[in-house]
């Protein structure tokens, strides 16, 4: 039975397949949303509407005020951005335990938070979205530091600062153009990359657990569930193969082990090189059992009593069994064997 073998070629093929699968499940990066009153998309007719698909990513950005950038407002605006269901978003209300995305409270830093639209999140606190459902990103504060904790109204009502996310749906009319991930300047400064494009989304940032203060780079997007599952499956198969190979090697080594050492039988103490069993019973010579040791005990002379015409197995409760046997013709000195 051969053990499974995983050569370097198999590992390389598995890695290539995993990379290809991860490439298939990666989505697109939507145009970022710059969250402050300088973003004119909030005042657009019909509101700020996006049509993300499962697998897409969306960046929410809080432009800094010091030094001012291309998307900065005249004065810094303080916001907390919440993800809410459709009915709550239409009323501009956040629940008592809101789903906080980003807090814009760092005037000297550009803050960013990346949303990954996925049905199942590998992160315990990750966000999950259902296709063909509507969600809202809203800000319910009034733009001041003192109003950060407000959970209803605010700029969502007064300035229309909310974004409607129509997940898995097609746009009616004009859709916000989407670019592939490779074309998005993810590693460059967002302000410089999009300064010449007036139709970009504007969203304030918040240094939450998933938000980072960014100079040139932001947080890495969370891994997609299919890619994580594929990697875990490949690792499980590899571990299973290694365990099988180890088990097969142990099994073969055990089979190749020599059988338990046995004590050689007693030497040839009589005719035919075997222990002779006393006459009378018509029994022929008997081969020594494993572990027996026969030692001849000779009598003192002809005055010794005749030996027994049979053999008897003495109790072996306290050691190896002992046999008393007869060997040789009656006229010769008696040979008695016992086992030590």
Swiss-Prot record:
Residues 185-200 have a biased composition (Basic and acidic residues). InterPro entries: Cupredoxin, Ephrin, Ephrin_CS, Ephrin_RBD. It is a single-pass type I membrane protein. Keywords: Developmental protein, Differentiation, Disulfide bond, Glycoprotein, Membrane, Methylation, Neurogenesis, Phosphoprotein, Signal, Transmembrane, Transmembrane helix. It is found in: Membrane. Residues 28-167 form the Ephrin RBD domain. Pfam families: Ephrin. The modification Phosphoserine is found at residue 274. Residues 249-340 are cytoplasmic. The keyword Nuclease does not apply. Glycans are attached at residue 210. Expressed on lateral floor plate cells, specifically on commissural axon segments that have passed through the floor plate. Expressed in cells of the retinal ganglion cell layer during retinal axon guidance to the optic disk. Expressed in myogenic progenitor cells. GO terms for cellular component: glutamatergic synapse; hippocampal mossy fiber to CA3 synapse; presynaptic membrane. The keyword RNA-binding does not apply. A motif (PDZ-binding) lies at residues 338-340. Belongs to the ephrin family. Cell surface transmembrane ligand for Eph receptors, a family of receptor tyrosine kinases which are crucial for migration, repulsion and adhesion during neuronal, vascular and epithelial development. Binds promiscuously Eph receptors residing on adjacent cells, leading to contact-dependent bidirectional signaling into neighboring cells. The signaling pathway downstream of the receptor is referred to as forward signaling while the signaling pathway downstream of the ephrin ligand is referred to as reverse signaling. May play a pivotal role in forebrain function. This is Ephrin-B3. The gene is Efnb3.
